[in-house]
Amino acid sequence: MNKLICGLSSLGISLSSVQLEQFETYYRELVDYNSRVNLTAITGYEDIQLKHFLDSASLALAGIKGDEKLLDVGSGAGFPGLPLKIIFPGMKLGLLEATQKKARFLSEITAKLGLTGVEIISQRAEDAAQNPLYRQKYTLVTSRAVADMATLAELTLPFCAVGGRVVAPKKGDIEEEMDRAASAIKKMGGRVSEIIKVDLPGLQDGRKLVVLEKISNTLSQYPRRAGMPAKNPLI
């Protein structure tokens, strides 16, 4: 895990032997499970360290606290939520993943890593966000899903408590995308707080973190029914 260790040192993060072993286990189980269920196209040892583990950890640049209540929307193989949970074991983590096969992997890997305080939520984001158990209950919401920022705003901000934040990893030139998302962000009760450049060893390819602050309650009609935020973004 030398690539990961080097990158984390740039973030001021050092791992215990237990945490290092958790990352090794995560790597082995991910590659093994991926041979049966399509979780990721990235399977090389160094690539996973950089493009999955360190990329997930880069959210620490947004000032993550160890006692956050974090929701990872569209978690897939667990990124960025599970690496953040390994690094910050005191946080409470929700992994939202609608695909049953992926949700099953999340349940199994969480158990094998010995993590506690993790909830697997196997629902569509549009449905879960209308559930009082999850709506506006998180201090931090993230999603590494490949979606336009206008769509992501509608799928993430309703989960975020007022005063909390959404941190969305992005890549490349996002100026036009952010302009298109302005209306959706406002309608969800959010505002753009900052955009952080990610410049870490092995991750010097234009990655950014878009940080949204939740400043008011999301109106009850949002998010719209399943599929609408992606099909017809609020722009």
UniProtKB/Swiss-Prot annotation:
Specifically methylates the N7 position of a guanine in 16S rRNA. It comes from Dehalococcoides mccartyi (strain ATCC BAA-2266 / KCTC 15142 / 195). The gene is rsmG. One of its GO terms (molecular function) is rRNA (guanine-N7-)-methyltransferase activity. The keyword NAD does not apply. S-adenosyl-L-methionine binds at residues 74, 79, 97-99, 125-126, 144. Gene3D superfamilies: Vaccinia Virus protein VP39 (3.40.50.150). Its main location: cytoplasm. It comes from the Bacteria. InterPro entries: rRNA_ssu_MeTfrase_G, SAM-dependent_MTases_sf. Its EC number is 2.1.1.-. Keywords: Cytoplasm, Methyltransferase, rRNA processing, S-adenosyl-L-methionine, Transferase. It is found in: Cytoplasm. Belongs to the methyltransferase superfamily. RNA methyltransferase RsmG family. One of its GO terms (cellular component) is cytosol. This is Ribosomal RNA small subunit methyltransferase G.
